[in-house]
Curated annotation (Swiss-Prot):
GO terms for biological process: protein transport. InterPro entries: BTF3, NAC_A/B_dom_sf, Nas_poly-pep-assoc_cplx_dom. Component of the nascent polypeptide-associated complex (NAC), a dynamic component of the ribosomal exit tunnel, protecting the emerging polypeptides from interaction with other cytoplasmic proteins to ensure appropriate nascent protein targeting. The NAC complex also promotes mitochondrial protein import by enhancing productive ribosome interactions with the outer mitochondrial membrane and blocks the inappropriate interaction of ribosomes translating non-secretory nascent polypeptides with translocation sites in the membrane of the endoplasmic reticulum. The gene is EGD1. This is Nascent polypeptide-associated complex subunit beta. One of its GO terms (cellular component) is nucleus. Keywords: Cytoplasm, Nucleus, Protein transport, Repressor, Transcription, Transcription regulation, Transport. Residues 21-31 have a biased composition (Basic residues).
Length: 155
């Protein structure tokens, strides 16, 4: 094999310009330290919190209309100090995802946001209906072939 051709191939394959190859950067996964959780537990013990059993779900309503939903959370409460601690994986969901089972939990503010949501949904339906009507107008340019085949129409 030609030495010049071999040298060109080796040069094109070489990755780094300096000695060796560059170091690869790896993502380090930081484990959540248990010290924060322990500090939180000790401060809650000072408040004399008691666990509350049989809570199926917790929903926190945000001002933008979304809901933070906790399914089967662990809840601890201290009524004299007006402190509630909720543990679990919270998911941010839209109000529409939780509507059937959440209606009895809605307060006056949330009902107003639900009305706004319903109005915006109706407006979207109207806009989609108008878009479909406009789409039907485009179909008028295409001739209808009722009872005939395409070949007979062309001939």
């Amino acid at each position: 094999m030609d030495q010049a051709k071999l040298a060109r191939l080796q040069q094109s394959v070489r990755i780094g310009t300096g000695k060796g190859t560059p170091r690869r950067k790896t993502k380090k996964v930081h484990k959540s330290s248990g010290t924060d959780d322990k500090k939180l537990q000790t401060s809650l013990k000072k408040l004399n919190v008691q666990p509350i059993q049989a809570i199926e779900e917790v929903n926190m309503f945000k001002e933008d209309g979304n809901v933070i939903h906790f399914a089967a959370p662990k809840v601890q409460a201290s009524v004299p100090s007006n402190t509630f601690a909720i543990y679990g994986n919270g998911e941010e969901k839209e109000l529409t995802e939780l509507v059937p089972g959440i209606l009895n939990q809605l307060g006056p503010d949330s009902l107003a946001s639900l009305r706004k949501l319903a109005e915006s949904y109706q407006n979207m339906q109207k806009k989609e209906g108008e878009a479909k009507k406009e789409g039907e107008e485009d179909d008028e340019d295409i001739p209808d072939l009722v009872g005939e085949t395409f070949e007979s129409k062309v001939e």
